[in-house]
Amino acid sequence: MGLLDIFKRKDKDRVPKEVEASEKTDSAANMVKEIREEILQKTAIPCMKLELTDTKPSLFDSKVGGIGYVPHDAKIPEDSKGVQLRLLAQIDCAEITLEDFPHQGLLQFWILNDDVSGLNFDDNTLQDTFRVLYFKEPDRTVTEKEVCEKVQDSSSDEEEDYFPVRGCYGLAFSEDVDTISYSDYRFESCIRKLVQQDYPEEAENLLENMDDFFDGGSGHKIGGYPGFAQWDPRSSEDTHDVLLFQLDSDMGTDWKILWGDCGIGNFFINWEKLKNCDFSDVLYTWDCC
């Protein structure tokens, strides 16, 4: 047997091992693909995707930032110390087509303009430094000038920098379908149950990097699944099971929205309370990298 024959034999011996490794890789990839597709199908729910526009919204339009509707006989929302909150966003509910959400009136999100954007680390459902308000039939005789006269001119330039919204923007709505994000607290249990059920022998290996194959839930939206820069503050015991509103950091030619170091803001509500248009119990959170 010559030297060439020895090399040929070694190549033949090596090929089956390489093929076997390749087949294992392909098999694992196929399993991940199958699991991903099944989970996407099982978790798909409708949502409204939102985009900022450069239009000038009126007092009654959907908007991010700017001046929000306030009834004739009402004050701008304040915290327990008498400090006014600022309008984070206003939604014209006639633009929402999702089931169980209100389809008329105005839904507003107000937060305190401080260094934590109104976040309460001890109780993120206490509507003191943030407020969620719903006006089923807003009074169309209210004017923007009238509301502006109620605003306290007490914000310094330093305080102004804390507010996540830079300016005022309109909102464009589009119907979409959202699938579970790896940020959602239900993601791991959902994945684990399916993998252990269908692929018990490969479960641990498959679960290790499964979140790499799913979306993080970012973007502006109503309904759907949330995104977080760090983690979901909810747990399986939490009753705030619906994403009421999410506002992400957004950079155009310049930063339009910035939560801390490029974070995301979220508002959650219980499904039954949403159906009853009861916005007294809402969980507000935001986080950043």
Regions found by a protein language model. Name each.
Residues 3-289:
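Preference for intrinsically disordered or flexible, low-complexity segments
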